[in-house]
Amino acid sequence: MSFPGLSLAKSALSSTIHRRPAVREVLTFTEQIARTAALSSAPRAAIEATRTARLDRVLAAARETPFYRDALDDDVVRRRDLSAIAPVTKAQFLARLSDTVRRGVVDEREMLAFVRAPERAGTLLSDNYLVAMTSGTTGQVGIFVNDVESWAETRAVTFARIFRQQLNTMDIARAIARGKTRMVFVVATGGHYMTALLASRVPAIGRMVLDSTTLSVEMPLPVLVARLNAAKPHILHSYPTVLELLANEAKAGRLHIAPDIVTSGSERLSLPAREAIRQAFPATQLVETYAATECVHMASSCAHGALHVNDDACILEPVDDEGRPVPKGAVSARVLVTNLLNLTQPLVRYAITDQIEVLDEPCPCGSALTSVRVHGRTDDTFFLQAHDGSFQAHPPIPLELIFLSVPGLLQYQLVHETQNALRVLFVVEKGALGAQVAALLDAKLSRYLIEHDLYESVRTSLEQVDAIARHADSKKVRQILSRVAPPGGVVRAAPEVRERRRRPRSER
């Protein structure tokens, strides 16, 4: 006997469940991580087939945005001819922010209000959209948005490729047998920063096997070391400059952890940093990632250390200054990125000022994914002298956090001009008051110096300018730039936060 009413009720219930963002996120993540793992060792034809299907999907989505509508006629879309689409810059994109999202999503006013509320970091805008901000390598703050399903796909590709060596029956069984895997992210917190969002928005199915903790990169090093010693992570992720500091703490006998995997991102992993990490954690697998807030899943390294582009999820076009493709083995002037996963705010041929080199020789790991080498992408570590004469190492990411979430700030550069003399150059948004922006920057910079016991010994100056010069060769804005050579003596960790009376600037 059939019960039509019961069938209709079941169908309605299923539809209701699938409309819930949390459910869609879990289902998409689970499906895509299996798909991505299979493609990691697939022949090139299978990768190209997935890439083509996703390109068709993202071009169709881009046509629904006012920003791309005119550039994507039927012929361009049918031929999948990316070369017929003019590259877009970050400035062009942000100038028409509301036009970059699909119809009926969110507008610029809603996005700006959301990112200016740091307490809402990790939550969803309109119960469906994840919003992140970045300054990237241009010094200009940008806002980017994903829907929950696009974000679940992004997470799945990112994690499946980073942990490609662990996605096998034996390693999965071993991980389950030992209980939850402890993963610690030492990253920028307190705002809508992509890596922190990657750490915090773990799907329910992931929380069954993963205990994820986020620690602020702004913590004084002794506090951070103590927290890591207590957490004893199996997996540790941070920025290369921070990982290098932590490696030195381990070699000095203060950091007592033995992670199975260390992953790095947001900065280029330099040879000195790589060597320091390997010396400090000789049994650890080191994985380098290449990512941007606009496209988190660009590349990750294999067991042989080669960076492999996630060709099934993004298209990277290395080009010269004139926008012409560069051959394999040549270093590009910039990269045109097409994100094949974000259907809410499609990015097609979006220019980032990174320099990459596509490697010609096949990788010993056997992967059919493209191998690349990233050049440049390095801000400086500042070595500041405390009042007792000792030096402190301050990596760039915590310094960059001083400048994010400042209303009215368009672009910035922090320069270590001479020993213990910092100079801030900044550009304000149209209509913003320079004096107000300067006052807020001064307060945030002073707070940082107080927290690191440097307020008495470091001089600062701020200057509003019309534009910030780009590097002559890389064409990038060096946001955190040091003109001071590293000290030859002992460098110690920044001290724990201490309460200090702030003297008026006129007394300094």
What are these regions (language model features)?
Residues 1-133, 140-173, 178, 230-235, ...:
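Nucleotide 5′-phosphate-binding alpha/beta core
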Residues 62, 134, 183, 236, ...:
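Residue-level signal for inorganic ion chemistry
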Residues 149-152, 158, 182-241:
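AMP-binding/adenylate-forming
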Residues 180-183, 334, 421:
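Residues that mark the start of a beta-strand
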Residues 216-219, 223, 233-274, 287-294:
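Adenylate-forming
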Residues 236, 336, 341-344, 348-453:
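AMP-binding/adenylate-forming catalytic core of the ANL superfamily
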Residues 269-362:
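Conserved AMP-binding/adenylate-forming
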Residues 318, 337, 384, 469-470:
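Hydrophobic beta-strand positions
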